[in-house]
Amino acid sequence: MLIRRLALHQLRRFSAVDLSPQPGLNLLTGDNGAGKTSVLEALHLMAYGRSFRGRVRDGLVRQGQEALEIFVEWDEQRADHPPHRRKAGLRHSGQDWKGRLDGEDVAQLGNLCAALAVVTFEPGSHALVSGGGEPRRRFLDWGLFHVEPDFLSLWRRYSRALKQRNALLKQGGPSRMLDTWDHELAEAGEPLTSRRQHYLERLQQRTVALAASLAPQLGIQGLELSPGWRRHELPLADALLLARERDRQAGYTSVGPHRADWSVDFHSIPGRDALSRGQAKLTALACLLAQAEDYAEQRGEWPVIALDDLASELDRTHQARVLERLLNGPAQIFITATETPAALLDLTHIARFHVEHAQIVAVP
């Protein structure tokens, strides 16, 4: 996956900018607050439907404007398809949105996000390891969404059934109607959990190997899924039935894949609560790069790699290890920094851009 053009309109500080990235490494430098991160935000928004710094309506649209617009043009280079050029556009006001993909309107934002794959490491990425379960569930589902074409329909089926069951619980609905939605939840939730389990097992080997290469002191030994109910003891249908009275009192469904989580097992660190912020960042980075490598193997092309403020997030040793691994592969990489990171000072084959006064200028 190779981005050829990125155009931003009315996004944070930018009125209108047009960027032509190059294959390999693209370095964006500039002072703090110049807008470097906004470029990566735009890519992330196109790939995930949201910014990694909050909701669109929370400051992503330039002050005084109605909506932001993003246009991306890229070459898709999958092993099972001939190379071809793709185009996507998004107009987002924070409330309403309109998207186009390859000249056609898209009805669901997920269809737009399915086209462009971006793996992002940014200052908040440590939450993947040290935060609550929601970002870890999103991590699993994003990977499955991109490598298993029917996963999205399965996920939507489960989400729809969960919404209906929760509504019945709040309304005090009859047991026969709850029976119907319990059955639907189990029919979608069991295979959804099996997909997550198999995917995490696949990532485990890569994550352990990556961590041993990038940060051996972490001693990462494996990844473990908590499915959201005692799956080793009983099927989801039984778990839902057993929890029904408790769920009636609470007004929501307390068991199932929506309560799932996963954890990293360490050799000598007792758990995520004992991690320093730096250890959490390195662990998250190992997981994210493992996901990118798995995507590349399954799809036959690399996702775009976006590394925000790398020099502030990692020390020189770990910067060098990460960049050495990435630069030995075919991925297109975007890095932001206030100045050229030490690990890149001796490299010549880099596309350099400077961000200043709401403009992006290519540096010869």
From Swiss-Prot:
GO terms for cellular component: cytoplasm. GO terms for molecular function: ATP binding; single-stranded DNA binding. Its main location: cytoplasm. It is found in: Cytoplasm. InterPro entries: DNA-binding_RecF, DNA-binding_RecF_CS, P-loop_NTPase, RecF/RecN/SMC_N, RecF_2. Coiled coil: none annotated. One of its GO terms (biological process) is DNA synthesis involved in DNA repair. It holds the Pfam family SMC_N. ATP binds at G30, D31, N32, G33, A34, G35, K36, T37. The keyword DNA repair applies. Keywords: ATP-binding, Cytoplasm, DNA damage, DNA repair, DNA replication, DNA-binding, Nucleotide-binding, SOS response. The RecF protein is involved in DNA metabolism; it is required for DNA replication and normal SOS inducibility. RecF binds preferentially to single-stranded, linear DNA. It also seems to bind ATP. Belongs to the RecF family. This is DNA replication and repair protein RecF. It comes from Stenotrophomonas maltophilia (strain K279a). The lineage of its organism: Bacteria, Pseudomonadati, Pseudomonadota, Gammaproteobacteria, Lysobacterales.
